[in-house]
Amino acid sequence: MTAWQPRALLALCAIGLCSGASANLTFSGTLNEPPPCTIDAGNTIEIDFGDVGVKRVDGVRYRRGVGYVINCGADTLPWALKLSVNGTPTAFDGSAVQTSVPALGIRVFQNSLPFALNTPMDITLSSPPTLEVVPVQQPGATLPPARFTAVATLLAEYQ
């Protein structure tokens, strides 16, 4: 391109011989907050394993169901609901909550499969997963006679 060509093009555009189109853009929307949810009306869910034999902890015996009810507001669409069990996992099982006894954990199951702690999963409010828990011990460990406790949080949230 010679030196005069860019100047000529600029002059043509300046006097209106070059044309273009423009349009205005308008953006709008509504910010919505997801409906509030509660699990068991905010009450603590307690699972008592009773007396557990130190030599009988095998990940099968003492299995218990976790009864819970999720209640959310009436307008749940189009929100995607997620459920998680949050707590400190044992060093030997990512699906087991650490108890007050170092070599003992409480494994969590969802629909009979191990439920990885601190990992949200998609659920449907009309058919939430069945949750179960069972005591498990670290392989090769010997459990001492002792009372044990463990704490986790069952969390339902919209994404």
Model-inferred region functions:
Residues 9-17:
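Bacterial N-terminal signal peptides
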Residues 2-4, 21-159:
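Mature extracellular/passenger domains of Gram-negative fimbrial/pilin and adhesin proteins
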